[in-house]
Amino acid sequence: MATDYDAGVGKVHSAFCDERYWVARLADSGADEARLDSITLGPDGSVDVVTTQVLRSTRLPALVTQFHRGDLEIQREESWTGLADDRADAVITGSISGAPVSVTGHAELEASDAGARLTFQADVTVRVPLVGGKLENFIGNQLLELLGAEQRFTTRWIAGEC
C-alpha cells in the first residue's frame, strides 16, 4: 500500500511528532471512542505513539460479530525513526482486545517527485479455523481504507485546515 503527500517528508514527519496532530486525527477517525494513550519523542527525532480506538458492536458487519461478541477495542502502536537522508521508517503493530487478531507492519516515508510517499506493508493474522482468511481479507481492505483516510487527514492538517 502506498499514499502520496504534496508536502515534503519533513512536514509529514513533523506532524507525526505532534501530539495535537494525533488527538485531532483520532477525533476524525470515525471510531466511537478514540484516545491517545501515549506519545514519546526521542532526542533523535523518533516518536513512539500508542492509540486505542473502540468500534461499538452495533456498527460491526456480520462477518465480525459471528466471531467476536461486544465492542472492538483496537490498540495500535507506531514507532517512527527520526529523519535521516529525507527518510523515516516505522514499525507498526495492532491488536484487538479479546480477539485472535494481530497486525504487524513496516512503513517507509521518503521523498517523491510530488513531495513525500508513505509505503506500508502489513501482515494480518486471524487465528480462527476455516474462516481466518476471509477475516484477514476483510481487515486488509479496511486497512486500505484507513490509510487513505489518514492520508487525507494528514494533508488537511499540514495545510492548516484541521
Short names for language-model regions:
Residues 23, 37-47, 95, 141, ...:
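Subset-of-secretome marker
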Residues 1-57:
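Hydrophobic ligand-binding cavity/cleft-lining segments
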Residues 81-82, 132-162:
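A conserved amphipathic terminal alpha-helix motif
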Residues 36-91:
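Glycine-rich portal/gate segments that line the openings of hydrophobic small-molecule binding cavities
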Residues 49-50, 74, 79, 86-140:
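Beta-strand/loop substructures that line and gate deep hydrophobic ligand-binding cavities in soluble
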Residues 23-31, 67-71, 95-100:
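Short, solvent-exposed secondary-structure boundary motifs
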Residues 11, 21, 59-63, 134, ...:
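Exposed alpha-helical structural elements
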